[in-house]
Amino acid sequence: MAHKKAGGSTRNGRDSESKRLGVKRFGGESVLAGNIIVRQRGTKFHAGVNVGIGRDHTLFALTDGKVKFQVKGPNNRKFISIEA
């Protein structure tokens, strides 16, 4: 006879790998062309001057320079630019 009741399987116990999103280069930091500035889902930050936007909304530097964060427009959107 069994002395323990049979353990049922659980439906939990899974978790997705973290995606390492967020700001990679902060305001005032020097960047080289091609450096990733922000990894994001959607456009939390928008591309400003000398900043490109990737297929997954990643923002990256198009030229060498310093990162500049600014809030612009009627909707207070956050823009990231590169000042040469």
From Swiss-Prot:
GO terms for cellular component: cytosolic large ribosomal subunit. Pfam families: Ribosomal_L27 (PF01016). Coiled coil: none annotated. Keywords: Ribonucleoprotein, Ribosomal protein. It comes from the Bacteria. One of its GO terms (biological process) is translation. GO terms for molecular function: structural constituent of ribosome. SUPFAM superfamilies: Ribosomal L27 protein-like. Residues 1-22 are annotated as: Disordered. NCBIfam families: L27. Belongs to the bacterial ribosomal protein bL27 family. This is Large ribosomal subunit protein bL27. It comes from Shewanella frigidimarina (strain NCIMB 400). The lineage of its organism: Bacteria, Pseudomonadati, Pseudomonadota, Gammaproteobacteria, Alteromonadales.
